[in-house]
Curated annotation (Swiss-Prot):
GO terms for molecular function: ATP binding; ATP hydrolysis activity; proton-transporting ATP synthase activity, rotational mechanism. Signal peptide: none annotated. Belongs to the ATPase alpha/beta chains family. PANTHER family: ATP SYNTHASE (PTHR15184), ATP SYNTHASE SUBUNIT BETA, MITOCHONDRIAL (PTHR15184:SF71). It comes from Symbiobacterium thermophilum (strain DSM 24528 / JCM 14929 / IAM 14863 / T). The lineage of its organism: Bacteria, Bacillati, Bacillota, Clostridia, Eubacteriales. It holds the Pfam family ATP-synt_ab. Its EC number is 7.1.2.2. This is ATP synthase subunit beta. Keywords: ATP synthesis, ATP-binding, Cell membrane, CF(1), Hydrogen ion transport, Ion transport, Membrane, Nucleotide-binding, Translocase, Transport. It catalyses: ATP + H2O + 4 H(+)(in) = ADP + phosphate + 5 H(+)(out). ATP binds at G156, G157, A158, G159, V160, G161, K162, T163.
Length: 472
């Protein structure tokens, strides 16, 4: 059956209007292709149908640059959405939004390809996540534990360490977990994707990872859809092979940003702060597909850029509703040189529940937050009147809070070359034990510096003894 053809009517940046003959209008979300277009016949471009305008015209979003495209060019209707290869042949390879390889190693010969637009699992098939996923990062495992098969958000402004955290989590979870992982680079720096690829080769895990990139330099159409490409690959492993898959997305804000860029060109009236009016719908469509079913699970870790450090901005605020755990990276913590710069009072998790993590873990976590909250309340008094005006009880709380703050830091594997400190993976049981001992006052005699950038409490005690020996 021959492909219906249309003609380009108008080109507005990343948006292209196409006219088709009567009775051959392509469906929404179907892919249209331009073959050997442009003056030199060197343009091969995929468009996705976004709107029906009437008069047999459709408005489409381009998945690549429209430079050199001309009105009147022939457009072919593929009569299907964008389809991408899935299954084990995709592992160890790098793809673009269309499922084409971009690592210079030739095409992928996968017997199965799936459309990137799919329905989320039905309510009866969804399996709620209630098991903790150890990350080896103390502040996360203690205060905002991640659920296996859950959705996790890393919130932070510019330059507070979201990508480093994603890379550390890939190191700690993907390498130890041993299952398959999908990494979707959405609108971020190409350099970071390149670094990650080479790190995975060095670590010997590249054959268990598929990487999909639609980076900063690409048109908004590619950045809008690349997360769906990565998700489709993850869904196949979950649904057809019954596996537990890890899906890393860096950065989900760029997905929203790309939608915002395209929205105005599509003629939609902008909503709050200039975002697209369909923001909640687009986010829900993506997030509802990232879930655990009776067959397998997708555990997703999503970095979320927070514009101007404002968590009430519509883009991060819309994402909040979908997450099981939120890890908030704070500039105030970053300025204290505590890394990872996780805000222990803002970060939350649905599974920080005594029935899931255990009574001891829950009580230690709440005890830590209580001490840190009291310290935060006392900071104004300390700033105005000084420490001497505090009661003995408050002085003790301040001393323990400062130790807890420092003990929430730890050396990271992916930052070894910058810090010259070997990275550590701390078992959640050791994390709970360490903070419990600080809360009980067992280490009140040690200097607070002993707790900075160490793994377990035993390492802190050893470091403290060395510091005391140097002083004496």
């Amino acid at each position: 059956m021959s492909e219906p053809t249309g003609k380009i009517l108008a080109i507005m940046g990343a948006v292209v209007d196409v006219e088709f003959p009567d009775g051959h209008l392509p469906k929404l979300n179907h892919a249209l292709v331009i073959r050997n277009g442009g003056e030199r016949g060197d343009i091969n471009l995929t468009l996705e149908v976004a709107q029906h305008l009437g008069n047999n015209q459709v408005r489409c979003i381009a998945m690549d640059s429209t430079d050199g495209l001309r009105r009147g060019e022939t457009v072919y209707d593929t009569q299907a959405p964008i389809t991408v290869p899935v299954g084990e042949p995709v592992l160890g390879r790098i793809f673009n939004v269309l499922g084409e390889t971009i690592d210079g190693k030739g095409p992928v010969n996968s017997p199965v390809s799936l459309p990137i637009h799919r329905e989320p699992p039905g309510v009866a098939n969804v399996d709620p996540a209630t098991e903790m996923l150890p990350t080896g990062i103390k502040v996360i495992d203690l205060l905002c534990p991640y659920a296996r098969g859950g959705k996790i958000g890393l919130f932070g402004g510019a330059g507070v360490g979201k990508t480093v955290m994603i890379q550390e989590l890939i190191h700690n979870i993907a390498y130890k977990f041993g299952g398959y992982s999908i990494f979707a680079g959405v609108g971020e720096r190409t350099r970071e994707g390149n670094d990650l690829y080479h790190e995975m080769i060095e670590a010997g895990v590249i054959d268990k990872v598929a990487m999909v990139f639609g980076q900063m330099n690409e048109p908004p159409g590619a950045r809008m859809r690349v997360a769906l490409t990565g998700l489709t690959m993850a869904e196949y492993f979950r649904d057809e092979q019954g596996l537990d898959v890890l899906l890393f997305i860096d950065n989900i804000f760029r997905f929203t940003q790309a939608g915002s860029e395209v929205s105005a060109l599509l003629g939609r009236m902008p909503s709050a702060v200039g975002y697209q009016p369909t923001l909640a719908t687009e986010m829900g469509y993506l997030q509802e597909r990232i879930t655990s079913t009776k067959k397998g699970s997708i555990t997703s870790v999503q970095a979320i850029y927070v514009p101007a450090d404002d968590l009430t901005d519509p883009a991060p605020a819309t994402t909040f509703a979908h997450l099981d755990a939120t890890t908030v990276l704070s500039r105030a913590v970053f300025e204290k040189a505590i890394f990872p710069a996780v805000d222990p009072l803002d970060s939350t998790s649905r599974i920080l529940d005594p029935n899931i993590v255990g009574r001891e873990h829950y009580e230690v976590a709440r005890g830590v937050q209580k001490v840190l909250q009291r310290y935060k309340e006392l900071q104004d008094i300390i700033a105005i009147l000084g420490m001497d005006e505090l009661s003995d009880e408050d002085k003790l709380i301040v001393a323990r809070a400062r130790k807890i703050e420092r003990f929430l830091s730890q050396p990271m594997f992916v930052a070894e070359k910058f810090t010259n400190l070997p990275g550590v993976f701390v078992d959640p049981k050791d994390t709970v034990k360490g903070f419990k001992e600080i809360l009980e006052g067992k280490h009140d005699d040690l200097p607070e510096q002993a707790f900075y950038m160490v793994g377990t409490i035993e390492q802190a005690v050893e470091k403290g003894k060395k510091l005391l020996a140097e002083v004496s």
